[in-house]
């Protein structure tokens, strides 16, 4: 693992400095080194780590990747039967390296596997992919440069360490010699307290968390002027979240990036406090340092300039591929170019993300990506959240419909149609609008377009037609 040699360095240079702080407990660099090194002799060649956020998690993770060891991080919130299934799969599928009880707390060979990552698939069992130590070392170098991570930063990633965004944030800080903080569980009040009292200068989180923290922070007069950097991933920042974040943390540069667990970083952009945002834009910036991006069709051929197709990346940050669950579609390669099937195009301003091909709406022979419609709707005053889908239609094949959650009071179809005239092309605008009491979300917490269509078909009380 590329951060273990760095832990040794920071423990020598700054033994009493804080390395990790979780739920009020702190570990200095010397303590982290000592506790992790003491665990290495009893740590097997392949570890499945399934723990809530804690100091012990950080120690065990460091020990679990010493030398040639490999680690799979499981979500403790998963059902016990699923956890047991994954543990069995890891133990039977992984190719363990030779390890010894006298191994030091040190990085293994750059090309060796250290991480067995788990990512949601179409089945109940997550897909598993593997990563080399070199891939994360290259990722660290790129992200530290792009996000401007400094040793005097204090990073707070309030989500679960089992999620790749937060696990990477921990490892990146250990590599950079910068303090990392998280919480036992996400709690708005606890995050606000950390921002106010624990010298936090940097937030790493998903857009839904940022919106909640910003809006409640503004209401509660929580001072976030000390935040220098906000890093978001997981979905595109909508206009309302961005506006609230800029008001709450007025001195922060807000970064968002596009990537995938299997690909690592692909593109990104940073918006300084003085820059105006691009309302409703699908652009997610320019290629990340060390990454090349192109758009290829399904045969692996370049599309015409500005054309839609598979977003493909070529870099040393890409994973090794799947350990299990490879359906031939989730991660595809065209020579040195790799894609997870996200669709987009390259414009003068950078890479534009349109979403997954499976979500595409085919209406009157035209392709419409609901992600683009949703971003435009979220930029409309009075809209708190939005979701678009393709409803079967005898005339068009499918027609674009949209549901919105109002931010306050009521909203009309006329208001929505008028607001989209200058943002979306005519053939991309919804033909029917619905007001929602809440977003349609699956049992796994994912927003579902199919569930929206089910609500509409069954006249669910959570959805009400606004007319055409």
Question: What do these predicted ranges mean?
Answer:
Residues 203, 315, 321, 336, ...:
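AMP-binding/adenylate-forming catalytic core of the ANL superfamily
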Residues 425-446, 466:
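AMP-binding/adenylate-forming catalytic domain of the ANL superfamily
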Residues 286-290, 301-331, 368:
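Conserved ATP/PPi-binding loop(s) of AMP-dependent carboxylate-activating enzymes
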Residues 292-313, 348, 409-413, 448:
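Conserved beta-loop-beta connector loops within the AMP-binding
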Residues 138-154, 162-202:
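Conserved AMP-binding/adenylation subdomain of ANL enzymes
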Residues 3, 8, 14-43, 83-84, ...:
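Conserved AMP-binding/adenylate-forming core of the ANL superfamily
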Residues 202, 216-279:
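Gly/Ser/Thr-rich phosphate-binding loop
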Residues 28-29, 114-141:
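Conserved AMP-binding A3 loop
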């Amino acid at each position: 693992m590329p951060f273990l040699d760095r832990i040794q360095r920071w423990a020598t240079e700054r033994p009493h400095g804080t390395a990790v702080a979780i739920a009020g407990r702190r570990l200095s660099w010397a303590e982290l080194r000592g506790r992790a090194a003491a665990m290495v002799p009893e740590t097997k060649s392949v570890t499945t780590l399934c723990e809530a956020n804690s100091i012990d998690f950080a120690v065990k993770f460091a020990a679990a990747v010493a030398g040639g060891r490999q680690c799979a991080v499981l979500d403790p919130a998963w059902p016990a039967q699923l956890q047991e299934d994954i543990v069995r799969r890891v133990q039977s599928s992984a190719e363990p390296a030779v390890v010894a009880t006298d191994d030091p707390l040190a990085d293994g060979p750059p090309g060796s596997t250290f991480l067995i990552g788990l990512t949601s698939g179409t089945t109940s069992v997550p897909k598993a992919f593997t990563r080399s130590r070199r891939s994360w070392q290259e990722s660290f170098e790129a992200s530290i440069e792009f996000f401007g991570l400094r040793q005097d930063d204090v990073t707070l990633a309030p989500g679960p360490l089992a999620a790749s965004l937060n696990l990477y944030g921990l490892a990146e800080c250990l590599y950079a010699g910068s303090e990392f903080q998280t919480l036992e569980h996400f709690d708005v009040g606890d995050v606000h307290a950390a921002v106010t009292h624990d010298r936090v200068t940097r937030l790493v989180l998903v857009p839904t968390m940022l919106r909640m923290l910003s809006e409640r922070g503004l209401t509660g007069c929580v001072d976030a002027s000390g935040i220098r950097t906000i890093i978001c991933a997981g979905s595109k920042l909508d206009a309302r979240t961005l506006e609230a974040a800029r008001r709450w943390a007025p001195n922060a540069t807000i970064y968002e990036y596009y990537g995938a667990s299997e690909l690592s970083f692909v593109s990104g952009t940073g918006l300084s406090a003085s820059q105006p945002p691009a309302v409703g834009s699908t652009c997610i910036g320019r290629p990340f340092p060390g990454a090349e991006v192109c758009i290829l069709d399904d045969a692996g051929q370049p599309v015409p300039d500005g054309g839609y197709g598979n977003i493909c990346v070529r870099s040393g940050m890409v994973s090794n591929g799947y350990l299990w669950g490879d359906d031939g579609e989730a991660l595809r390669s065209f020579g040195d170019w790799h894609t997870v099937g996200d669709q987009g195009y390259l414009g003068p301003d950078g890479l534009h993300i349109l979403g997954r091909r499976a979500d595409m709406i085919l209406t009157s022979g035209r392709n419409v990506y609901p992600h683009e419609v949703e971003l435009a709707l979220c930029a409309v005053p009075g809209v708190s959240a939005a979701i678009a889908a393709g409803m079967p239609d005898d005339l068009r094949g499918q027609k674009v419909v949209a549901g919105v959650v109002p931010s306050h009071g009521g909203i009309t179809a006329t208001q929505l149609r008028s607001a989209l005239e200058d943002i979306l092309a005519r053939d991309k605008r919804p033909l029917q609008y619905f007001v929602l009491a809440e977003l349609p979300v699956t049992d796994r917490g994912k927003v579902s377009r199919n569930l929206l269509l089910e609500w509409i078909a069954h006249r669910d009380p959570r959805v009400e037609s606004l007319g055409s």
